[in-house]
Amino acid sequence: MTIALGIAPIGWTNDDMPDLGKEVTFEQAIDEMALAGYQGTEVGNKYPKDPVVLKHYLDLRHLKIASAWFSAFLTTKPYEETEAAFIKHRDFLHAMGAKVIVVAEQGHSVQGMLDKSVFDDKPHFTDEEWQRLATSLERLGDRAHEVGMQIVYHHHMGTGVQTTAEIDKLMAMTDPDKVSLLFDTGHLVLSGEDPLTIFDRYHDRIKHIHFKDVRPEQAQQERTDHLSFLQGVKNGMFTVPGDGMIDFKPIWEAIQKQHYDGWIVVEAEQDPAKANPFEYALKAKHYLDTIMTIPHAV
């Protein structure tokens, strides 16, 4: 088993709401990631776009790139348009030494809309859209394989693949050799799903993991007040492992049992003015150190 522990930059700066953490520099974020003891990170909007420059900054801090988010529009735009953007994204990540590409379908998504409930207004794909999505994801998987990489699909609040039933459908419709799965604890729990059920069902397809925790009071408010995803983030519905309602110990035990090989990335979209990113990075690291034993790094 080969695992590395990383942390996403969204606790420092938020790509969907640039005002959150606008004062935080790229250098501050990666300095604090390294100081907190993480081995790598995912790519944020403030990161240098030149792989040579980015690698220089990260090498100084002994950090690596685990992956980066890619927004696909396979249900709403011509495939060729998404593929062209994907190849550029793929080549950047390949130059950075990443092995997986995080893909999430944004066709009809409400995750970036302030006035749309993440539950009431989430999209539901038609049969034709499901087929387009599945076929097109397999084609992107082929493009990833050209450079020895693979895509990992990110189930996400406010999108057409949010629930267990929707994850099941996507997995059933796609070739396991071409489409892998990203396992995100926070999005599953917030959606009302059981993370262990998903992990046990798809452990052989899970090639990337996000450890995100959920605050119970804010999670309930997300439903009862019909809040949008972005409103929920500002309200503090997400936090780091060890600070919310999720017990990560049985999840870690399941990960060990199945000999998972890859990155575990700590994530928590929060307002850095309310939740100091460095303090929360340390909080997560200290908590995970009490339940996890990582044999060696990727």
Descriptions of predicted regions:
Residues 1-100, 123, 127-128, 134-135, ...:
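N-terminal pre-domain/capping segments
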Residues 4-8, 66, 101-106, 204-215, ...:
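Non-cysteine beta-strand/loop elements that form the S-adenosyl-L-methionine
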Residues 10-12, 44-46, 70-74, 106-108, ...:
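Active-site beta-loop-alpha junctions enriched in small/polar residues
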Residues 19-24, 108-118, 219-231:
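Short, flexible, mixed-charge acidic loops at enzyme active sites
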Residues 41, 134-245, 295-298:
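Acidic/histidine-rich catalytic cores of soluble enzymes
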Residues 79-181:
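Active-site acidic/histidine proton-transfer and metal-coordination neighborhood
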Residues 261-290:
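C-terminal/domain-terminus segments
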